[in-house]
Structure formats: C-alpha cells, structure tokens
C-alpha cells in the first residue's frame, strides 16, 4: 500500500474554491468550452450598418469581418448579443460586428474617423502601432478624456506608414468584450511583398463571465484558472522517468517557493473561448485559395489575455512582416505571438485543405480555421501539445543551472540557501555578495520612473543588474539577478518540439534602423509582480503610485526591460518605435510590441520624436489593469 500523505507536502494541497451552486449549474462541458458553438458568433448582423456606411464584405473567406476603405469612416460602439458557448451574452461591438470592421487606409492619406458612443459608459479607440499626434492616440486619462455616452469624437491624422495593424478600445474591459478590429495600410509605392490574394486572421479570446468578476477571482487566488496543476499521476510518471528523488526534490522546490510550475497563463480554456476572426473552432473560419497561389496571411493577436502558437500543418510559413514592418523573409513551421503583435506570412498551398491552428501557450485550448479551395471543407485538427513545466532558465535566466540567480524575498529559504531571504538588504547572485542593491547610492529612485544611466555606453546595453529599492517589498515575489539576454529562445513549450519555430533573433528589419545614432543615455525598468496576490508593476510600483518616465524631445535613448516574473509580457510603447537590439548591441528589428520572456533582459532604442503624453504597458489586459502601466512624457 502506498502512503499518499507525504504527497500533501509536494504541491497537492491546493483545492479549487467551490463555485456557487447557481454558477456551477451553468458550467459547460469541456468540449463546448474548447470547440464553442458551430454557429456561435454575433447574433446581430452588420446589415443595418452596412447599408448606412457602405460596408463592403470580403468574398474570399467565410466568417471574415466586413471591410471599410477610403479616408472617411463612421464607427459606432454599442452592444450586441453573442453566443459562443450556448449561453447568450452581450458583447461590446463596433458597427454591430465582432471583430470590428477591417479598416483599409493608404499611406500618405489623411483619414477622418468619427466614433459615436452608444454605450452607457465612456469609450475610446486606440490605433495600435500607428504613428500619430498624441491627441489622436485614444488613451483616456493620457491623451484625451475619452468619449462620453452619446458623444462623438473625431479622430483625424495623416497615415505615415504601411502594413498590418489593429485598433481596440482603451477603456475598461471593452477590448475583452469585443472592441477590436484590423487595420490594413497599403504602401504609397508598389508593395514589395507580392501575393495573389490575402486574408486577415485576427485571433482573440472571449469569456462568458464579466471580466471584472474574472479579475476578482484572480485577486482571490492567482492561479484560480490553472487546471494544469501537478497531479499524483504526474508525480509517479516523473518518478519513473527521472527517479524518485528528482521528482520529490522538484516538487518540494516549487512548493516551498509557493509558485506553480504550470502557471503559464492567467486564464485558460476553462473560462475562455478562443476565436479566429470572431469564429469558434467548431465554427471553422475558412479562407479560400486556388492551388498554386501565393497567399498572404495577415495575423493579428487581438486577444486580451492569450499568447498563441500558430502553425499550418503541411505548409511552411515565410514571415515577411512583423508589427507592420517588412523583415528579411524567414521560413518557419510555427511562430508564437502575444496580444498586440502582428505577423504577415506567405504560404503556397497545393492541396485542397489546410488547418490554421493556433494553440494557447498553456495548451488548454486553441483557435482554428481552414484554408480551402471551397467553403465547407476542413482538414484534420492537430492535438494540442502536452503542457510543460517552467524551466530553471524561466526562473533564473543565465543562472539556470543553479539557484543562486534568483531572489524570492523570504520563501524557500531552507531549500535554497544560496538565495537572499534576509530582508533583501543586498543581492545574492552566487559570488556577488557584498554588492548592496538596497541602497544603490548615487541613483535616484524617488520618482520610480526607471533608472537613468546617462554615462553608459552608446554601443551596447549595460550588463549590470540594478534593482530599485521599490522592488524590495510585499508586491514582489521574485527578482532575477542574472537574467538571460539571448533572443534565440522560442519559449516554453516550443524549445524541443521538432518544428522550426520563429524567434526574435530571426527577425531583421529591411533597411536597418531608422536612426543611426547611438544611445545618449539608458533607462532601465524591471517588470515585476506577485502572482499569488495578482499584482503587476514596473519596479514594484503600480501605475496609480508611479510618476511618468521622461524622454527628452529628439534624444536617442536605450531602454532596458528586465523581467523579474515567471510570465511573458508583451510590452507596448505608444507613439514611437522600439528598435530591438541583439545582445551584442547591433540592430535587430523595429517593433511596437515586444514580448519579454521570464528572467529575460532585453534592450531597444527609441528616438523620442513624438511630443506629448504616451502610454507604455503590458498588453495582457489584466496585467495592465493591475498596474503594469506607465505614462511616458516626451518634452
């Protein structure tokens, strides 16, 4: 007989809170959660708005958003009934559509967009990745006051770029409830990316629950929706493969750290339905093609909370654009992208059908559609990959072979004596004792606006890790003292899957950097949080307690982001390009949204050529809402 009592000390003591009986009675079968309804979607069509606004509809795909093109646009934000899971709900929609209509612009034109608010609360539209005057950026409290109920706001700006972008609300939880759509900008000159046809593929996620209730549950228990917790069966499987001692030690370590090795995403398929162009997996969005054509697929991650891993079994993907900017073509089998990012890929289908498969990073579900020669066809849908545990490199960066590189602020002291748990007066990094990063004399952290290293090298980011005093407190559950700086890691779940996976190191912007100057100074910020308390911040300071980050107008500044958490954060700076650097300081790629992996330290250059007030935040909506947000002032 096996005595299972010792297993209670190995991470099996947590019990999910019991749901109220009124809610439990409405729980859906897992298949319904993952697949959704075959006909699930917006119940109120766009016909009324189409007649009023002259909306055209694409005729080469089924389930695609309507398309508006030109220079004058009228958008109305209101509510529409939807049903993705069998439970009718109200969504927040644009012109009665989810996703919102695709907007097609032309580089060099001046566009005018009138946005009417038919909600009972304020709303807004942010033009994600678009370079424009800050007054047109659409962030309430930063660039304008928002659009009050019943009011109309007119956005007007010149289009200075081309490529694939998107737009979404920046008010409350409206992005999560449906206010998002694609933007396609035709270049002023001939497009160097040649294709016979194209499809916009916008991925998103949907929850039947009120997003504020979801957030309240996460505040109660940070891993509330994590249904991939280690089980007794997993323990015995690991013991047989790795040995009993290794299996026990691994679980003991995680349990003493009070962290979950499988907490890759805040929300899972147990509360989310994954959508492709507003269509459930069972609904099967379909993009048409003729065999032998070169097809351009414009992928947009418009999800509020989901990283997607995208592949099309049977087809190679040639990545030609990232965040709307052309890159040197790179052929892969798969790519990962987070909320806010976009990728354009070319494919050349030969057969009748292919599945467009986008599995969530935590492997609890997927979005899917079909490329087909005619409507009604479908191809085999792959099984989701097995979920993986976070690796040591995801916790400690460059110190992945030992435990000296991470500081847990009081937890796991007995098991990991090489870590500093004594009140965080200094820094423990296995041989760097005596370096006091609690006082850091000479650095000004009073404003919590990031560390300014004005004297640093112009050619390469500094390598010394500096933690602000504000990182030493209850709102922080870990600090990484020796982060990894490599860009060639595809991330957890993709490292050894047998497929060629895109990494940041593969991306090289055509034409090089926009600004040849080196950095005049450095600003370092740490991405911080406490997963158990579900709080997120920069340098341990939530947005409501922070002061702005200041850029001097016209300067070339290097920004260093250091991820002191075990989650990947897609970081989005409004109004200016982020020019990603390789570890050796060379230019890599121009981005508007950069994913920063756990225990990773990245750097990018910014030319502060956009006067005004701008937002800078994690694009995981709940992280942003809980404090991982800063204002940037360019003056």
Model-derived regions: residue spans:
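Histidine- and aromatic-enriched segments that form or immediately flank copper-ligand environments
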Residues: 2-6, 68-194, 266-271, 298, ...
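Histidine- and aromatic-rich segments of cupredoxin/plastocyanin-like copper-binding domains
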Residues: 136-139, 145-148, 248-408, 453-475, ...
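Extracytoplasmic/periplasmic copper-protein system
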Residues: 63-65, 180-204, 368-405, 627-635
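N-terminal twin-arginine translocation
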Residues: 22, 26-32, 41-62, 635
């Amino acid at each position: 007989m096996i005595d299972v009592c010792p297993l209670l000390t190995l991470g099996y003591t947590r019990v999910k809170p019991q749901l109220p009986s009124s809610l439990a009675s409405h729980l859906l079968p897992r298949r319904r959660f993952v697949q959704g309804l075959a006909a699930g979607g917006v119940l109120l069509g766009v016909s009324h708005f189409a007649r009023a606004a002259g909306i055209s509809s694409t005729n080469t795909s089924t389930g695609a958003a309507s398309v508006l093109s030109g220079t004058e646009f009228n958008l109305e934000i209101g509510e529409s009934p939807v049903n993705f899971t069998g439970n009718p709900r109200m969504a927040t929609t644009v012109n009665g559509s989810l996703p919102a209509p695709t907007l097609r612009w032309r580089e060099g034109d001046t566009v005018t967009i009138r946005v009417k608010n038919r909600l009972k609360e304020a709303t807004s539209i942010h033009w994600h990745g678009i370079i424009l005057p800050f007054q047109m950026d659409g962030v309430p409290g930063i660039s304008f006051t928002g659009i009050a109920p019943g009011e109309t706001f007119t956005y007007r700006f010149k289009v200075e770029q081309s490529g694939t972008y998107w737009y979404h609300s920046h008010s409350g939880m409206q992005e999560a409830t449906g206010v998002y759509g694609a933007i396609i900008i035709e270049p002023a000159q001939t497009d160097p990316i040649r294709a016979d046809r194209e499809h916009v593929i916008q991925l998103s996620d949907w929850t039947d629950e009120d997003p504020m209730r979801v957030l309240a549950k996460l505040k109660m228990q940070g891993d509330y929706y994590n249904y991939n917790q280690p089980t007794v069966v997993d323990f015995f499987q690991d013991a047989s493969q790795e040995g009993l001692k290794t299996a026990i030690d691994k679980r003991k370590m995680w349990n003493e750290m009070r962290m979950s090795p499988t907490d890759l995403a805040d929300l899972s398929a147990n509360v989310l339905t994954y959508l492709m162009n507003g269509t459930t997996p069972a609904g099967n969005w379909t993009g048409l093609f003729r065999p032998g054509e070169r097809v351009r697929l414009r992928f947009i991650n418009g999800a509020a909370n989901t990283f997607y891993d995208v592949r099309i079994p049977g087809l190679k993907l040639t990545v030609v654009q990232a965040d709307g900017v052309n890159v040197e073509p790179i052929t892969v089998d798969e790519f990962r992208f987070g909320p806010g990012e976009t990728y354009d890929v070319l494919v050349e289908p030969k057969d009748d059908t292919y599945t467009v498969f986008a599995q969530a990073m935590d492997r609890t579900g997927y979005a899917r559609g079909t490329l087909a020669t005619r409507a009604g066809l479908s191809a085999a849908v792959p099984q989701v990959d097995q979920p993986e545990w976070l690796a040591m490199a995801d916790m400690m960066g460059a110190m992945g072979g030992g435990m000296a590189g991470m500081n847990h602020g009081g937890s796991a002291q007995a098991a990991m004596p090489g870590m500093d748990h004594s009140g965080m007066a200094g820094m423990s990094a296995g041989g760097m004792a005596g370096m006091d990063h609690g006082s850091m004399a000479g650095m000004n952290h009073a404003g919590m606006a990031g560390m300014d290293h004005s004297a640093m090298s112009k050619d390469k980011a500094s390598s010394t890790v500096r933690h602000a005093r504000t990182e030493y407190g209850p709102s922080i559950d870990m600090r990484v003292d020796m982060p990894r700086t490599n860009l060639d890691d595809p991330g957890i779940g993709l490292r050894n899957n047998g497929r060629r996976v895109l990494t940041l190191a593969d991306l090289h912007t055509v034409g090089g950097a926009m600004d040849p100057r080196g950095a005049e100074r450095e600003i370092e910020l740490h991405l911080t949080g406490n997963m158990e308390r579900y709080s997120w911040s920069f340098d341990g300071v939530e947005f409501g307690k922070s002061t702005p980050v200041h850029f001097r107008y016209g300067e070339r500044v290097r920004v260093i982001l250091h991820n002191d958490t075990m989650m990947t954060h897609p970081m989005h700076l409004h109004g200016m390009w982020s020019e990603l650097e390789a570890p050796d300081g060379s230019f890599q790629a121009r981005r508007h949204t950069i994913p920063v992996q756990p225990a990773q330290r990245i750097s990018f250059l910014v030319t502060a050529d956009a006067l005004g007030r701008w937002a800078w935040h994690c694009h995981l909506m709940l992280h942003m809402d809980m404090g991982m947000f800063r204002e940037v002032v360019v003056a």
